[in-house]
Amino acid sequence: LIERMQQELDDLRMFMDIGEGTITVSETEDKDWVNNWKNFFHQFYIDDLLVTPSWEEVKPEDQGRKILHIDPGTAFGTGMHETTQLCIRQLKKYITPQTELLDVGTGSGILAIVALMYGAGHAVGTDLDPCATEAVRENMEMN
């Protein structure tokens, strides 16, 4: 497979500059990559909203606050990415009971769920990732 890929790169060079075009193969340590990321995802605030992973307990001092429980599973969407946080801040600012939201590429459902938490009348999420459906269902139940 590597030899074939290298040949394809060499053929491509005849038409354009592809830079160095080297292929590197390495072996990675056998870990539970599906769950290992959880070691780095801890509760955090987006303004007044506490985003907390489903496997962490909410601290006593945070009880009574607006809390989003989230577990993306293998779908995308913890809320840690800056663009997600920007979207959440804008949703919080502009949501009304008349708001109808379409969340394309919903992943974990975080944006649709936040919209509903802040009073949107209706939210629909769609995603090509089949894992997203189960993640959204579980996250909706938690919230």
Role assignments for model-derived ranges:
Residues 61-62, 95:
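Short, flexible hinge/linker loops that cap or flank conserved catalytic cores
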Residues 62-63, 81:
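Short glycine/proline-enriched turns and hinge-like loops at secondary-structure junctions
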Residues 40-41, 69, 85:
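Short intrinsically disordered coil segments
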Residues 1-61:
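N-terminal auxiliary segments of SAM/dcSAM-dependent transferases
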